[in-house]
Every structure is written in structure tokens, then in C-alpha cells.
Amino acid sequence: MKTSVLLFMLGLTFLFDGLAAINLQEGERTCYDIGELCSSDKPCCSGYYCSPRWGWCIYSTRGGR
């Protein structure tokens, strides 16, 4: 019984993971979240900016350091 439940949960995990991967490939995203690669044609979401050094979306600091 425990094995059946475990296999069922594992199957659901793989199913939803596969569906999420297909959705990401089909539709283009309008913005990118923290830690994702960005460029001029792949902008970061609100609250982040594209690091010129690394090319990743990072947190935006208002006052700077």
C-alpha cells in the first residue's frame, strides 16, 4: 500500500513537471525572475534588473551601496 501511494505521487510529480516544461517551451515569457539569464530582448521582471557583469536578473536596490 505504501509503495502504491509513493509510486502514484512520483507519477504525478513527473506528469506536472513534464507539463510545466512543455508550457515554458511553447509560450514566450514576458519577463525573467531572479537568477535567470537576461539580455536586452529578455527583460527582468519588476523589482529586478539585468546585471551587466553576469547577465542574470538580480534584486534591484533603491539607494545603491
Swiss-Prot record:
Expressed by the venom gland. GO terms for cellular component: extracellular region. Probable ion channel inhibitor. Pfam families: Toxin_12. The keyword Secreted applies. It comes from Chilobrachys guangxiensis (Chinese earth tiger tarantula). The keyword Metal-binding does not apply. GO terms for molecular function: ion channel inhibitor activity; toxin activity. It is found in: Secreted. Disulfide bonds join 31-45, 38-50, 44-57. The presence of a 'disulfide through disulfide knot' structurally defines this protein as a knottin. Residues 1-21 form the signal peptide. InterPro entries: Huwentoxin-1. Keywords: Disulfide bond, Ion channel impairing toxin, Knottin, Secreted, Signal, Toxin. Belongs to the neurotoxin 10 (Hwtx-1) family. 31 (Jztx-15) subfamily. This is U12-theraphotoxin-Cg1a. Its main location: secreted. Residues 22-29 form a propeptide.
